[in-house]
Design a protein with these regions (language model features):
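Outer membrane beta-barrel
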Residues: 72-271, 336, 340-367, 374-387
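Hydrophobic alpha-helical segments, especially transmembrane helices
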Residues: 3-5, 166, 248, 416, ...
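N-terminal periplasmic/intermembrane-space "pro-region" immediately following the signal or transit peptide
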Residues: 20-90, 219, 352-359
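Gram-negative bacterial Sec-dependent N-terminal signal peptides
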Residues: 1-20
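Outer-membrane beta-barrel pore domains
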Residues: 24-28, 35, 60-62, 105-106, ...
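Compositionally biased non-globular segments, especially hydrophobic aliphatic-rich helices
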Residues: 13-16, 40, 111
Length: 449
């Protein structure tokens, strides 16, 4: 029986002169209480109806004053006019199985790890100013750390200014969030740029400033970044090592899909510090492989090109990078270049999301009850030429890697990934011996909110 059925009885009781002598003030007070009760009953009925219709269990409510509370994304978002506040995050649990050549002790290895356990808060003060702070509560240092934190100004007329710890603008794959990359780990190009040069990704304990621009009509965007990102915590020289990066992207609409084209540039002066080209070969829990080393690094310069095409469930993307390292005295140091190509197809018909302002891929939104299923094939190659010192036979190492992947987007927030990876290397050995063939298998369970 609905609550409203009781209202006529209550109204009738109030209209009849009570047996006791009630003042006019008391009568008016009782009427006001009844009116307030009616308002609350209406609100309760709306919430009950909303929850009954909402099969996902999430809630989205809006008051008459414009305040909305939304939990449909798994987190919580509160919005009132131009002001907003949201809490979100990501949980990624990985399983890695590797053959003996991925480890210096020459033994096969398999293990699990929490790859990322991040929680973030973000919001806006008004239509121009916003902020974000992300903490990794289970970082590699076994302590919570600030993964990202910045304030941002958006003119809404094509100009942005970001100050703090945030990603530098280089590389399509790096700009794409780890939540929405198509393979469990980003590729070898990203590893060389992020772990060796520190020209992509987020700064260590430093920060910087990024100037961005965008034009809606032409779908052209870009950014220029200057930041202190040297990550050698053992360095006694505390002077800043400034990194400068720039990126320009163009995202034209093409028939039923769209294209993506970009160029990037980065430079940094390491002031005689040591740099090492040692990376994990696509497996986060595997040992690093030392490809080259420079004890007195001067300038490091990178230039890259990127392209992608999406049409319905089909997507294609690739990048090429060239790197040159100089010694502090101006002579030539090690250099490397490489590329990758990736093709994916979503068997259930969905399309990969894309944000043209940032020039990056975004989430896949499942359309049916079985979720979205995606097949991925990737091939990449890098060559490292060490002209001075290191562990390289004949001064040159060539690495080829092939990845076959299957992704299941069970819901908008739950994702499962499976990757098989095969790596071949020329002119390279480690403590375990010959590393011509490196095979691995990876699984990931992911929840984002």
């Amino acid at each position: 029986m609905k609550l409203k059925l009781l209202l006529p009885v209550a109204m009738a009781a109030l209209m009849i002169q009570p047996a006791y002598s009630a003042t006019e003030y008391e009568f008016q007070e009782m009427q006001e209480k009844l009116q307030n009760a009616i308002i609350k009953i209406n609100a309760m009925e709306q919430v009950i109806k909303s929850n009954a219709d909402n099969k996902s269990g999430s809630v989205k409510t809006k008051s008459k004053k414009g305040l909305t509370i939304d939990t449909t994304g798994g987190g919580i978002k509160v919005k009132s006019g131009d002001q907003s506040f949201a809490i979100g995050g990501r949980l990624m649990m990985d399983y890695d199985s590797m053959d003996s050549n991925h480890n210096s002790n020459g033994k096969s290895f398999d293990d699990t790890e929490w790859r990322r356990t991040r929680i973030n808060i973000k919001g806006s003060v008004n239509k121009n100013w916003s902020y974000k702070a992300t903490y990794d509560i289970n970082s590699e240092k076994n302590a919570s750390n600030l993964d990202e934190g910045y304030i941002k100004y958006d003119s809404k007329q094509g100009l942005t200014i970001t100050a703090g710890k945030t990603k530098a603008d280089m590389m399509l794959e790096q700009r794409t969030s780890s939540k929405w990359i198509s393979t469990v780990e980003r590729g070898l190009l990203n590893a060389m740029n992020e772990k060796v040069n520190y020209l992509v990704g987020k700064p260590g304990d430093g920060a910087g400033v990024k100037l961005g621009f965008y034009d809606k009509d032409s779908r052209i965007s870009g950014a220029f970044s200057v930041f202190d990102a040297y990550k050698n915590d053992d360095d006694d020289d505390k002077s800043n090592i400034w990194h400068t990066t720039a990126r320009l992207t163009y995202s034209p609409k093409m028939n039923n899909g769209f294209g993506h084209f970009g160029v990037t540039y980065g430079v940094a002066d390491y002031k005689g510090q040591e740099t090492k080209a040692d990376i994990q070969l696509g497996i986060h829990q595997g040992d690093k492989t030392l490809l080259a080393i420079e004890s007195d690094t001067g300038d490091i310069t990178n230039i890259g090109v990127e392209a992608a095409y999406v049409n319905g469930p089909f997507s294609l993307q690739g990048e090429y990078f060239d790197n040159e390292t100089e010694k502090d005295n101006g002579t030539k140091g090690y250099e490397w270049d490489g590329y990758y190509g990736q093709v994916s197809y979503i068997l259930t018909g969905e399309t990969r999301g894309y944000k043209w302002k940032s020039g990056a891929f975004d989430k896949v939104k499942p359309a049916g009850k079985i979720g979205a299923w995606e097949l991925v094939l990737r091939y990449e190659d890098i060559s490292v030429d060490d002209l001075s010192e290191g562990t390289v036979s004949a001064n040159k190492v060539d690495i080829d890697r092939t990845v076959l992947g299957l992704n299941w987007y069970a819901t908008k927030t739950v994702k499962f990934m499976a990757n098989y990876s095969s790596v071949s290397m020329d002119n390279m050995t480690n403590e375990a011996g010959d590393t011509d063939d490196l095979d691995s298998f990876q699984l990931r369970a992911q929840y984002t909110f």
